Amino acid sequence: MQGQTQSISFDGREIRLTTGRFAPQAGGSVLVECGDTAVLVTATRSGGREGIDFLPLICDYEERLYAAGRIPGSYQRREGRPPERATLTARLIDRPMRPLFPAWLRDDLQVVATCLSLDERVPADVLAVTGASIATLLAGIPFNGPMAAVRVGLLGDDFVLNPSYREIERGDLDLIVAGTPDGVVMVEAGGNQLPEQDVIEAIDFGYEAICELIKAQEQLLKDLGIEQVKPETPTQDTTVPAYLEKQCTKAISEVLKKFDQTKDERDKALDAIKAEAAEAIAGLKEDDAIRVATASNSKLLGNSFKALTKTLMRQQILKDGKRVDGRALDEVRAISALAGVLPRRVHGSGLFQRGLTQVLSTATLGTPSDAQEMDDLHPSTEKLYLHHYNFPPYSVGETRPMRSPGRREIGHGALAERAILPVLPAKDTFPYVVRVVSEVLSSNGSTSMGSVCGSTLSLMDAGVPLKAPVSGAAMGLIKEGDDIRILTDIQGIEDFLGDMDFKVAGSEKGITALQMDMKITGLPVKTIAEAINQARPARLHILEKMLEAIDTPREGLSPHAPRLLSFRIDPELIGTVIGPGGRTIKGITERTNTKIDIEDSGIVTIASHDGAAADEAQKIIEGLTRKVNEGEVFSGSITRIIPIGAFVEILPGKEGMIHISQLSEARVEKVEDVVKVGDEVTVRVREIDNRGRINLTLRGVPQSGDGAGEEPQPTPVAPLS
């Protein structure tokens, strides 16, 4: 199996590209390697579909646990449905690829990236994105590439190119940027409340590196003797577009300038104009070119009408500076925010509305055992904060079957989750697992940013001590040549007919999440910087409205939320608390009706709806793990009697034995002659034998009522730090 391997020196590392060896029947394939990470990426094209008006592109990212030397934990020991992070990586490949294919292309396209080996120093996702571009170029598919992606981290004051998983976790920024020779085409980022300027500089830093990878791809094609297939727009019939422009321009323009109408009224007015045009065309002669063209292509009229509407709306924005709802370019829609809209059985709730977009978010507090276990290639194995996003059909006035979340729902949920993560309290101060669910009740653009705002409201209502409240806004863009307008808080039609969807979330201090998608082949960093800076006053305006509903997290939790107690024990004593076969900890939970989690570090978390029960469980565990010294005096009750002695519970869950010879100074024939089960006695620790058993004595120890002293207080347990 012959193949060619090209090496690229990139930021002090070697990236190896192997072509012609793997997947010979795929349209194009490349194995991208860096360190011990290896990703096989293929691109395949099949015949075109009739009667569709979209690009049927599928991008898949496949993880194989053998890549990390692991066997799946499922019953069948086989990978099943792609985990969430794999789905997000598939979207990461799709988003910069999709705008680079020609608008007329209707062939089935599929890009599959498979992670074959994973080095924790080299995450596979950005290699997969770059590999998708190479495989597509090798397949001879019309494509406005090359395209490449890099990750940028921030450690201290220094940007790090393609950081390791550990560096990502330690840093204040995790930014992925993809670009073409025309500019940046995709941005995805999470930041620790970073100033706008830091994020802009990171994007610029990343794009400079992207340009190196683009040159490397061009050189690869040259070395392989492959000529890139550039998209050429086929000749299209202009009779129908010209007819609609003549017949409908005035009517459409009048509708777009009725700023006081609702979305529904505008949509119905445009539909009426289109229906009138269709009726007029149907009245033309049977051999008329316009009638023949629309009859042979059922989607031609609709697509041409949509294109005309798009052109007129864009012209209105570029020339008049007015949007379809009359807002200025930097104006935010009317905002409404409420906290605590549901009964307190729901731990926290918030209702956020911006224009016609409405999101209901709920927050639920759980125990450490509620954390989500992640069975994928990522080094982190659990999630303590989860955000789930639901988009039912009624939110856009439609009907369709209700199914499990798709890629869009997963992606939007992950973005809103990432926006909140940097402001969540530390685990040792707030040990709850938190789940937020955002229900989109009405959608007219920017539902993901509405979910960010709703999440903040619900978390504050639940009493989660956020470091700072977070809001978000979606920015848009209209570009005709060098004429550019940036739009604040875009609504549905502006997203659909515009060139960019740029979501920015953050606190007053700085940015926590970014996501930018383009419909054009790239933007200069300068324009992206303008959009980021224009988003800040919008975010702060939205945040101000939210804080009118709730300005600080509630002091008390819902009475229906679990109460958690956390403290630390010696990790070497974890086995003592658990007991043989888990008997000890099971007995504590049954006795106190609590839920107990113990981490390997020795952190114990007790969950209960009854504070007294949690306190009791803590005392038992502290008793089990408290060190007992010879000579200490304790008061306790007789728990059981055997022929040779009696057992005393000297601390919660911890017993010692009084040998019959230690019950009295005088000779004792029968244990029951001195003590009975339930008697309260004061004992001294006589010795602790080499098996850890505690031997007690009553001899020489004053009992209550005859001058006995107070029981020594247990040694305090070290607080969490």
Curated annotation (Swiss-Prot):
GO cellular component, one term: cytosol
Family as reported in the entry's similarity comment: Belongs to the polyribonucleotide nucleotidyltransferase family.
Needed co-factor(s): Mg(2+)
EC annotation from Swiss-Prot or TrEMBL: 2.7.7.8
Listed HAMAP family: PNPase
Main localization category: cytoplasm
Example of a GO MF term: 3'-5'-RNA exonuclease activity
Entry protein name: Polyribonucleotide nucleotidyltransferase
Any one of the GO BP annotations: RNA processing
